[in-house]
Structure formats: structure tokens, C-alpha cells
Amino acid sequence: MRDSHSHALTSVSTESDTTMSLFCRRLRLEIDLSRGDVSEPILPVGYRWLEWSPELLDRHAAVKFRCFETEQDGQIFPSLRSADGCRRLMDYISGHAQFVPNATWLLVCDGIAQEGVVDCGSIQGLAPIPDSGAIQNVGIVPEHRGRGLGRALVQAALRGFLASGLTHISLEVTAANEPAVRLYQSLGFRVTKTLYRSVDEC
């Protein structure tokens, strides 16, 4: 999802430090799954899920880079700016003690003729505190957007968290990414906090 709204970034300086610090405005959204089931995701014809396995790490990293390389988050977050950065990020997520494989999915499309299978979306999950899950890096490659795949990815992750006994789920999104914010809210997420992240920390 592309977004070029300038209000996502804020410059801050102090009297004691003339260096300008760049911040991005982020929203934390949360959903409580203990009150109801999550609808089963519906994929268009030709698309299917690949559940997590370590052999898919490089494919997750590659599709993550394709999802974010031309997007605002790809300019803001160092880990999303390069293929190597996305590989390191996937190493970190999948090697984390609180990694949730059930909430981690690769979305593929069975291409036609010489194209073969095309990786077109990715999502990961962590469980940073008891009973709680955190969605990481929802991404659909540009040429497959507008087909409801982002919604399906989030639903698949939510069902995976539930299957792992996690009912309080959160995520963060750049505030200027209004289509993503609307998507999450339509699934039942609500904004609980506004955060200002230093770009150097992102």
C-alpha cells in the first residue's frame, strides 16, 4: 500500500542539540479474540497458503523486500530497505524465543505457463508477553494488491494466534498508511496508542 503523506514524519530539535531528529508517527492497534471466532480467510482462485517451515525463510525474506522496497515503510525502516536487511529481520523473527509459527504464513499464487509458483505475500507472528501476540510485517507484493489478500493474511495470522492460545493481539502501522489502518479496523482492531518512533530506532 503506497502512501506519501508527509505528516508521517516529524522533525524535532532541542536547544542543547541542534541536530534534527526524524520521527515517524505510528499507531498501535489491538484486538481481543476471546470474545469471538475469527472468520476463515477466503483466497481467490489460484492462491494458497504455505505454513511456516525453516526452509521457507529465504522466500519470506525475498517477498518481504518486494512488498516494502518502494513503500514509505521501506524508506523509514532500515531493516526493510534492502534484501539483506529483510533476510536479517527474518532470521531475528524466526529465531526469537517467542516466535509463533502458527501465525506465520507465506501466500503463493500458482502462476501460468513458465511463471510457476509466485510468492506474493507474507506475515509473521511473535508472542512477546503471556497470552498476547504481535503481528509482524503484513505485506502483499504490488502486482497482487486489491484482491483481499491482505485481509486474508491477517485473518490467517489471527486464527494461528488463537490456535496457540493467544487472544490479545496487537500490531503497529505507520499512521499515514490509511488503507492499512482502515483494513485493520474493519477486522475489529482498535487504535490504543500513538507512538513516535525515531527513524534510527525503526
Would you name each region that the model predicts?
Residues 1-6, 161-172:
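Conserved GNAT acetyl-CoA-binding A-motif
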Residues 137-140, 146-163, 181-186:
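Conserved acetyl-CoA-binding loop-helix of GNAT-fold acetyltransferases
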Residues 104-106, 114-126, 134-139:
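Conserved beta-strand in the GNAT
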Residues 101, 127-135, 145, 164-166:
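A conserved beta-turn-beta hairpin within the catalytic core of GNAT-like acetyltransferases
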Residues 48-74:
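A short beta-loop-alpha structural element at the N-terminal edge
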Residues 1-53, 198:
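Acyl-donor-binding surface of acyltransferase catalytic domains
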Residues 78-116:
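Active-site rim helix/loop that mediates acceptor-substrate recognition in acyltransferases
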Residues 2-24, 147, 151, 175-193, ...:
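Conserved active-site alpha-helix within GNAT-family acetyltransferase domains
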